[in-house]
Curated annotation (Swiss-Prot):
Assembly and oligomerization: Part of the 50S ribosomal subunit. Contacts protein L29, and trigger factor when it is bound to the ribosome.
Known function: One of the early assembly proteins it binds 23S rRNA. One of the proteins that surrounds the polypeptide exit tunnel on the outside of the ribosome. Forms the main docking site for trigger factor binding to the ribosome.
Protein name as it appears in the record: Large ribosomal subunit protein uL23
Keywords assigned: Ribonucleoprotein, Ribosomal protein, RNA-binding, rRNA-binding
A molecular function (GO) term: structural constituent of ribosome
One annotated Gene Ontology cellular component of this protein: ribonucleoprotein complex
PANTHER family noted in UniProt: 60S RIBOSOMAL PROTEIN L23A (PTHR11620)
NCBIfam families, per database record: PRK05738.1-3, PRK05738.2-4, PRK05738.3-2
Gene3D superfamilies the record matches: 3.30.70.330
HAMAP family: Ribosomal_uL23_B (MF_01369_B)
Matches recorded under Pfam families: Ribosomal_L23 (PF00276)
Length: 95
């Protein structure tokens, strides 16, 4: 991906993500499924002006959903666990 604004889709606001942020200083983002770790790191550093130490990614499979007799499926998506460098501030208070 060439556009850094197309890489990040938004933060993942779950209980697990909040615990990871408090304990390890990690932030979880929903990202474009075809983006790689280098693009994710570059996008976060440019958009939020923070230093990224490490990026881990996980591809999430779409779930099967049923409405009456009709069976469908949610889209597959990707999330990134981003570890911030020591001394970086908590920037998710602004989100």
């Amino acid at each position: 991906m060439k556009n850094i604004y197309g890489v990040l889709k938004g933060p993942v606001l779950t209980e697990k993500a909040a615990i990871l942020q408090e304990i390890d200083g990690q932030v979880v983002f929903k990202v474009h499924p075809k983006s790689n770790k280098i693009e994710i790191k570059r996008a976060i550093e440019l958009m939020f002006d923070v230093k990224v130490k490490d990026v881990r990614t996980a591809s999430m499979r779409g779930k099967e959903k049923r409405v009456g007799k009709t069976v469908g499926q949610t889209k597959e998506w990707k999330k990134a666990y981003v570890s911030l460098a020591e001394g970086e501030i908590n920037f998710t208070d602004e989100i």
